């Protein structure tokens, strides 16, 4: 008998615990950019990285959102979780801590209270590389100022997808102002 599995695949690959409410919030935000149907099935999933905390990434080959969550990580690792299925399961769990364990052959155990689910994940190596966006100087401004900027311009944004260029707001940043 020949085993094609590597030793790493047979071991525990990731384990973390976090609050259900934080996990739901992260899935709601990162899930906004997950592709619903794609010729590249891995982008229908959420890239889940557990290191110091938990990082959830959704990407549709145009837009990416990464959401960081406080989590107790006992075993660092990463995998791709099926976004819709994982989100549906987490939303139905009881309130409190949720423990996710990714083990042998990317079998995922999700536990909270008396509830327990098992699903399959995929290797994070299959996830497309995200574009580098750290090319400029970061801009910091209070949340209320950003909200006022958006509120003052959002009325002019088109909802018609026929001309995607009109469905966004352009920010121009100079040394001392944002317009």
Named regions from a protein language model:
Residues 1-179:
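Structural preference for solvent-exposed beta-strand-turn elements
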């Amino acid at each position: 008998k020949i085993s094609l599995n590597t030793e790493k695949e047979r071991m525990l690959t990731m384990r973390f615990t976090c609050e259900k409410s934080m996990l739901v919030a992260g899935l709601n935000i990162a899930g906004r950019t997950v592709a619903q149907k794609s010729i590249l099935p891995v982008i229908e999933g959420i890239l889940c990285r557990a290191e110091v905390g938990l990082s959830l990434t959704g990407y549709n080959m145009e837009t990416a959102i990464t959401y960081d969550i406080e989590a107790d990580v006992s075993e660092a690792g990463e995998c791709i979780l099926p976004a819709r299925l994982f989100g549906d399961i987490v939303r139905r769990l009881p309130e409190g801590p949720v423990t996710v364990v990714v083990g042998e052959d990317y079998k995922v155990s999700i536990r909270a209270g008396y509830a327990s689910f098992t699903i399959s994940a995929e290797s994070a190596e299959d996830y497309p590389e995200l574009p580098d966006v750290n090319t400029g100087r970061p801009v910091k401004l209070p949340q209320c100022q950003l909200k006022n900027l958006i509120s003052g311009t959002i009325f002019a944004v088109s909802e018609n997808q026929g001309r995607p260029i009109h469905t966004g707001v352009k920010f121009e940043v100079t040394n001392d102002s944002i317009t």
